[in-house]
């Protein structure tokens, strides 16, 4: 089960559009994608409402886990999305 702590770096944080992109990428994979602001308080990364409720602004550290089939591929895709500013430019 891959796990990473990663910083939200885009200017608007994990707002509605960014959360929708995150959930869209997570949904492409059959594995579970728990994510949260603390390692013991994880939510379903495939739920738009759960991801938006994290209220993760710019600079927030999030704990990202993947477990199951294609978990490494899912982790790589989600980390790439976050590191590419959710394809929003900054």
Curated annotation (Swiss-Prot):
It holds the Pfam family PTS-HPr. GO terms for cellular component: cytoplasm. Keywords: Cytoplasm, Phosphotransferase system, Sugar transport, Transport. InterPro entries: HPr, HPr-like, HPr-like_sf, PTS_HPr_His_P_site, PTS_HPr_Ser_P_site. The active site is at residue 15. Its main location: cytoplasm. GO terms for biological process: phosphoenolpyruvate-dependent sugar phosphotransferase system. The keyword Repeat does not apply. It is found in: Cytoplasm. PROSITE patterns: PTS_HPR_DOM, PTS_HPR_HIS, PTS_HPR_SER. It comes from the Bacteria. Residues 1-89 form the HPr domain. PANTHER family: PHOSPHOCARRIER PROTEIN HPR, PHOSPHOCARRIER PROTEIN NPR. NCBIfam families: PTS_HPr_family. Belongs to the HPr family. General (non sugar-specific) component of the phosphoenolpyruvate-dependent sugar phosphotransferase system (sugar PTS). This major carbohydrate active-transport system catalyzes the phosphorylation of incoming sugar substrates concomitantly with their translocation across the cell membrane. The phosphoryl group from phosphoenolpyruvate (PEP) is transferred to the phosphoryl carrier protein HPr by enzyme I. Phospho-HPr then transfers it to the PTS EIIA domain. This is Phosphocarrier protein HPr. It comes from Pseudomonas putida. The gene is ptsH.
